[in-house]
């Protein structure tokens, strides 16, 4: 019989990989990545980021003497094809809890001539908890600290290599791909920024954060390892940062239990909200031409870099939903495809939270003032000057809507719905 196949999906790494180590304990392995067209229907920047990290994973296999197959096509066709060609004894992978991942894995299992073994992914809390939580705090209280992460294999058995990895022009500079770069970034953050994370995490320029989200989104960096290393250092910064990592798992938990949140608000009252299909307003928001400095700077940075701080994301999202009344789903999708870290579950949770649509305890009547938010979280205006230099301050300049009138309009509509 042949080797065991280790099928990498949202886990483009060798460290802290239960499926890889389980397979290695049972025999020689060959890695596999399937370039799934269902996941590659996105922007060039996101395709390029994914492909460069697949390339880095292949190099990691090679450096340890192993081989990674890369096949292009539908997983329920290509995984069985690889298993047959290699005469594989079984396929190992980490469990996916997304709606598409569960559908995909069911079809692959049906088509495979050998067993498919799915092992738990190293979440901080498993998304498939039997009780469904809609509020973050009781969910987070279940967390008791990170379990020790698993080490990467020192060596991998030799095997045949198959498949080419295409090139894609991202249209913008990308971070250094691969888990070595991710681990180096984690070390740098823990040493230099974690001690002040609690005080600086809300900076609009994102310099108080880790900037590791593009690696987490593809599983290039294990969240369990990240939490473990942060908790070893301790302090308020570590506590706050691990809480943010738990928000990621809360996002997966929500999408697992409420898969329909991808299409409609968690709060059923807001399914009847009168969103405004205004193409001119949508384009003004999307292109960063609203006349509202914080929003314009945020959208321009996102277009230019594929990254945005959490504080800027919340403000850009809430302005679209609450001030402009734009359809939240269209905006969420457009926003996600600009992000290098465009994780569907995380972005859906973020937009429904910012929009007051039922995620967590975020009240619908909370409406950020983008002027005060800018002054508070970029007090010297350096971030604003970099991305929207035509604005001397955070005061609006010929805005597409009057901020106070738009706030009152939204609250009137939302309260009418909330009261039934």
From Swiss-Prot:
Its cofactor is FAD. Keywords: Chromophore, DNA damage, DNA repair, DNA-binding, FAD, Flavoprotein, Lyase, Nucleotide-binding, Plasmid. Residues 147-176 are annotated as: Disordered. It comes from the Bacteria. Binds 1 FAD per subunit. Changing residue 240 to A: Reduces CPD repair activity by 20%. It is an enzyme of class 4 (lyase). This is Deoxyribodipyrimidine photo-lyase. Changing residue 366 to A: Strongly reduces interaction with DNA. Residues 2-124 form the Photolyase/cryptochrome alpha/beta domain. It catalyses: cyclobutadipyrimidine (in DNA) = 2 pyrimidine residues (in DNA). Pfam families: DNA_photolyase, FAD_binding_7. FAD binds at residues 197, 209-213, 241, 248, 310, 341-343. DNA binds at residues 201, 373. Its EC number is 4.1.99.3. Involved in repair of UV radiation-induced DNA damage. Catalyzes the light-dependent monomerization (300-600 nm) of cyclobutyl pyrimidine dimers (in cis-syn configuration), which are formed between adjacent bases on the same DNA strand upon exposure to ultraviolet radiation. Monomer. The keyword Cell membrane does not apply. PANTHER family: CRYPTOCHROME, CRYPTOCHROME CIRCADIAN CLOCK 5 ISOFORM X1. GO terms for molecular function: deoxyribodipyrimidine photo-lyase activity; DNA binding; FAD binding.
């Amino acid at each position: 019989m042949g080797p065991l196949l280790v099928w990498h999906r949202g886990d483009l790494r060798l460290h802290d990989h239960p499926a890889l180590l389980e397979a290695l304990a049972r025999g020689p392995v060959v890695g596999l990545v399937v370039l799934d067209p269902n996941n590659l229907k996105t922007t060039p920047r996101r395709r390029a980021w994914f492909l460069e990290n697949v390339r880095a994973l292949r190099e990691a296999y090679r450096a340890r003497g192993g081989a990674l197959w890369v096949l292009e096509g539908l997983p329920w066709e290509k995984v069985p094809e690889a298993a047959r060609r290699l005469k594989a004894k079984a396929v190992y992978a980490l469990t996916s809890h997304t709606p598409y991942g569960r559908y995909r894995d069911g079809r692959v299992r049906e088509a495979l001539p050998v067993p498919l073994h799915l092992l738990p992914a190293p979440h901080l809390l498993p998304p498939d908890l039997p009780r469904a939580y809609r509020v973050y705090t009781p969910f987070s209280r279940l967390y008791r600290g990170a379990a020790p992460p698993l080490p990467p294999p020192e060596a991998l058995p030799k095997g045949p290599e198959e498949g080419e990895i295409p090139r894609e022009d991202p249209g913008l500079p990308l971070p250094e791909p691969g888990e070595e770069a991710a681990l180096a970034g984690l070390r740098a953050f823990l040493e230099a920024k974690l001690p002040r994370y609690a005080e600086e995490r809300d900076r609009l320029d994102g310099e108080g954060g880790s900037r590791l989200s593009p690696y987490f989104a593809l599983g290039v960096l294990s969240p369990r390892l990240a939490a473990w290393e942060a908790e070893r250092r301790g302090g308020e910064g570590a506590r706050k940062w691990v809480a943010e990592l738990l928000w990621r798992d809360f996002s997966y938990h929500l999408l697992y239990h409420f898969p329909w949140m991808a299409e409609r608000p968690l709060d059923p009252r807001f399914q009847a909200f009168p969103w405004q299909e205004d193409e001119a307003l949508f384009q003004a928001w999307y292109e960063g031409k609203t006349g509202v400095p914080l929003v314009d700077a945020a959208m321009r940075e996102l277009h230019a870099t594929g990254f945005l701080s959490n504080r800027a994301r919340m403000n850009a999202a809430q302005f679209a939903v609450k001030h402009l009344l734009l359809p939240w789903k269209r905006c969420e999708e457009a926003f996600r495809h600009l992000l290098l870290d465009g994780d569907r579950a995380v972005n859906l949770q973020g937009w429904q939270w910012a929009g007051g649509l039922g995620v967590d305890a975020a009240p619908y009547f909370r409406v950020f003032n983008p002027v005060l938010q800018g002054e508070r979280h970029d007090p010297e205006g350096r971030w604003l000057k970099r991305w929207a230099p035509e604005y001397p301050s955070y005061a609006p300049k010929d805005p597409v809507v009057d901020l106070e009138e738009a706030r009152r309009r939204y609250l009137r509509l939302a309260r009418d719905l909330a009261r039934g």
